[in-house]
């Protein structure tokens, strides 16, 4: 393990050479740019869906009382489904998790732990995951809230884990700390299926959505 990463918290590890790092937002923007090459594709941002109904076609009611008609509808709201479909909402639990980004940690401090620019994720039920980005900044994620209430100090909450795993790095102030929702299911398997012949859904990736949502999207398409 020492040739890749070193920490007093971990005694052994498995190295997977088939995996890599990804910037989630850039990946999302890249997908959007590819979709927009198709002139029949339209992306609506900041457009809340109020309701929908299905007969021969699907009618989607969005904000400002605007209706959109479509042959098919795929519901992929995940943890943010709200009251759009209460049956689907009951199949998932929105759970909050947290990430901190550090831009002020000197390279010599990071070199104490990172031998190579790898991504690390542990096997805890509420796992810790962290990596160095392309600018050698530390991105550290972990923690969970099942109550939908954030800790009073998000950064301090994450630093408790950093102190155990990367001792000494917790003294540096985070550039930014944020929270977001993931949707978990009881059995931790994604919840995918159809409601009618022309309405489909996919949700509940239990923290693995970035890896498999593109595959699920192709399946539904």
Model-derived features with residue positions:
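Active-site substrate-recognition segment that forms the wall
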Residues: 49-54, 67-197
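Hydrophobic alpha-helical bundle architecture
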Residues: 201-208
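Internal hydrophobic alpha-helix adjacent to the cofactor/substrate pocket in enzyme cavities
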Residues: 161, 214-221
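Helical element adjacent to the flavin cofactor pocket in flavoenzyme catalytic cores
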Residues: 12-71
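Dinucleotide-binding Rossmann-like beta1-alpha1 core, especially the glycine-rich loop
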Residues: 1
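Substrate-binding strand-loop-helix patch
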Residues: 22-23, 209-212
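General beta-strand recognition
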Residues: 59-61, 139, 200-201
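Glycine/charged-rich beta-loop-alpha catalytic/anionic-binding loops adjacent to active sites
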Residues: 9-14, 194-201
């Amino acid at each position: 393990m020492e040739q890749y990463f070193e920490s007093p918290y971990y005694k052994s590890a498995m190295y997977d050479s088939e995996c890599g790092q990804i910037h989630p937002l850039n990946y999302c923007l890249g997908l959007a740019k590819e979709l927009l090459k198709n002139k029949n594709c339209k992306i609506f941002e900041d457009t809340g869906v109020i309701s929908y109904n299905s007969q021969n076609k699907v009618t989607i009611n969005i904000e400002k009382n605007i209706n959109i008609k479509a042959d098919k509808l795929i519901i992929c709201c995940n943890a943010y489904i709200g009251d759009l479909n209460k049956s689907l909402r009951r199949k998932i639990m929105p759970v909050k998790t947290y990430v901190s980004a550090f831009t002020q940690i000197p390279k010599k401090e990071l070199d104490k732990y990172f031998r190579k620019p790898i991504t690390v994720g542990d096997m805890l039920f509420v796992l810790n995951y962290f990596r160095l980005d392309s600018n050698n900044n530390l991105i550290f994620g972990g923690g969970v809230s099942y109550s939908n209430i954030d800790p009073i100090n998000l950064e301090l909450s994450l630093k408790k884990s950093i102190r155990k795993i990367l001792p000494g790095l917790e003294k540096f102030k985070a550039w930014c700390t944020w929270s977001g929702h993931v949707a978990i299911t009881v059995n931790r398997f994604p919840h995918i299926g159809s409601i009618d012949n022309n309405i489909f859904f996919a949700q509940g990736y239990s923290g693995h959505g970035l890896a498999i949502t593109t595959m699920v999207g192709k399946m539904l398409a």
